[in-house]
């Protein structure tokens, strides 16, 4: 289920980002990703430059980047749209979490977010060099009643294996 995008630009402008980053290790992209504020993320487009892009690779106190937070806090279409925009701005789909080495794809698999998992499999830059994905595919194949859904899962998986 998608959350409403209740973007609050005023709150973001009033935040002391230096202090916030000292306590949490999080910059504005983490907050936007956590709250699912896609509209606000789109408005930042004009501000993204070479000086801002490194913020997309910063890690919070838990060792996550904003792209991990987007996958952890959101599901389905909302997660896809946030991650897509963060990648467009310069985030890396294959960055691993410091706490357990998971990528965004690992998070999607663990959260059983089928929509996000299939979308990630279709991304040309995604790294599938882990057996978690094979087990996920097999589990999904067992669960799916519809032949069409089975084919979608297999097709996405096979596309990535042979790209």
Swiss-Prot record:
Function: Suppresses the host immune response through NF-kappa-B inactivation. Possesses ankyrin repeat domains required for NF-kappa-B binding but lacks the regulatory regions required for dissociation from NF-kappa-B and degradation. Therefore, prevents host NF-kappa-B release and subsequent activation.
Keyword Repeat in annotation: yes
UniProt name for this protein: I-Kappa-B like protein N3
Keyword vocabulary terms for this entry: ANK repeat, Host-virus interaction, Inhibition of host NF-kappa-B by virus, Repeat
Statement: the UniProt record of this protein carries the keyword Cell wall biogenesis/degradation: no
Family per similarity comment: Belongs to the polydnaviridae I-Kappa-B like protein family.
Entry's Gene Ontology BP terms: cellular response to tumor necrosis factor; symbiont-mediated suppression of host NF-kappaB cascade
Annotated gene: N6
Sequence ranges of the ANK repeats: 62-95, 100-130
InterPro entries: Ankyrin_rpt, Ankyrin_rpt-contain_sf, NF-kappa-B_inhibitor
Organism: Microplitis demolitor bracovirus (isolate Webb)
Pfam family name, one: Ank_2
GO molecular function, one term: NF-kappaB binding
